[in-house]
Every structure is written in structure tokens, then in C-alpha cells.
Amino acid sequence: DLLLSTRLSMTSGFSSRIDNVGELMNKGYELSISGDLIRTNDWKLTLNGMISQNKNEIKKLYKGNDISVGWNNLIKEGYPINVYKMVRWAGVNPANGDALYYTADGRITNTYNSNDAVVLDGKTPDPKYFGSFGANLSYKGWELAADFYFSGGNYIYNHIRFFTESDGAQYGNNQDKSMLYDQWKNPGDITNVPKQSINNSSYQSTRY
């Protein structure tokens, strides 16, 4: 089952409801271990660890229709849940400082078009693995514990960069220093920061 909030007509008196919109397959493993490294009348030291891996895939959606989630994510048959869909960043034109993007069919252009957004296979904000490890030390009724958590294998859209690297569009707000020091200035400059202009805009793309 795949339970999601779906919109309703406002004439119903409700804005949304939870519906079963498809089929989701989850599979993976979890391994945990715990043991006493030291055990005496006064002292006890216990170590523990856990790691988990999960893989999911959308097997079926109602009428096969894709579902947009937030700004850049998509629920689509045959892909992991929340897979990214966005326009691909192609760098900066060294001749004139224009921002460059890939079209849906792979050509390079200096014109941003949201219709050129493509599914980024295998790239989601959801961790591919996560886990924890820790220790617990006790002595005559006193106890000290520490736990650490980790995750990885996922891709996070950097919204801070989206707002602080606006290429001049948000000149009245705080901007990253790279906008000043690394920006394109002269023909032939090789950089990943386009020329600065108040007419620019920070578009949603794989740049961030």
C-alpha cells in the first residue's frame, strides 16, 4: 500500500484526505549487536551497534499518474519514492558568463525551462543506509552513555545555497562570498558562478 494525502474539492468541506494511491515495495535488512566488554561488581561497559539498509520501488500508481512532492521530488512507477526531478545544471559559458542548462534531450542552452526537468535515476533525499553505535559505562550506580547516529547514500537539495547564491537577483539579502570572489567577470573566465545581475534568478536545478 502507498498512503498519501490527496487534495479534495473545497466544496466537500475538507482540503485533503488520506488515500491508497498505489503499491510500494520495500526490502532491506537490519543488523544489530550488543555486548558487555567489561562486567565486574563495580564496573560495566556495554557496547552496541546497528546498521540498516532499505530499498524501495513504486510498483503501481493509480491510473499510472506521477505524483509531484514538494518542489523537486516525484513519485513515479519504477523508481524509488521521492526521486528527484529537476533541470540539470551545465555550468557557466566562459565566453559571456551565462548560466547553462541541459534540455530534456541533452542539448546545452542558456535558457532555463522547467519543462526540461528529468528524473534523476537513483537520486533521492532518503538515506540508502543508516545506523547507530554507542557505549554505556556504569560504576556503582553512576552511569554515562553516549550514542551516535549516521546515514548516507542520499542526496540533499541545498536550499541555503539556492537563496544565498542567487547570481545577483537577491542583492538586498545576505549572499555567499563566492558571488563576489568567484563570479564570471571577463571572457575566458572558467568558473561555476555566472555573471552577476539583478535580472538573474536562482532557478531550481542540480546546481544546488
Question: Each predicted region: which residue ranges?
Answer:
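Repeated loop/turn-to-beta-strand initiation elements of outer-membrane beta-barrel proteins
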Residues: 1, 41, 141-146
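Flexible, solvent-exposed coil segments and beta strand-coil junctions
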Residues: 6-16, 106-117, 192-205
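Conserved small-residue
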Residues: 19, 24-25, 29, 36-125, ...
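Residues on the lipid-exposed face of transmembrane beta-strands in outer-membrane beta-barrel proteins
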Residues: 31-35, 133-139, 146
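Transmembrane beta-barrel strands of outer-membrane/channel proteins
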Residues: 47-53, 137, 146-150
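Outer-membrane beta-barrel transmembrane strands
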Residues: 123-139, 202-208
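Extracytoplasmic gating/loop element in the C-terminal half of outer-membrane beta-barrel translocons
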Residues: 151-208
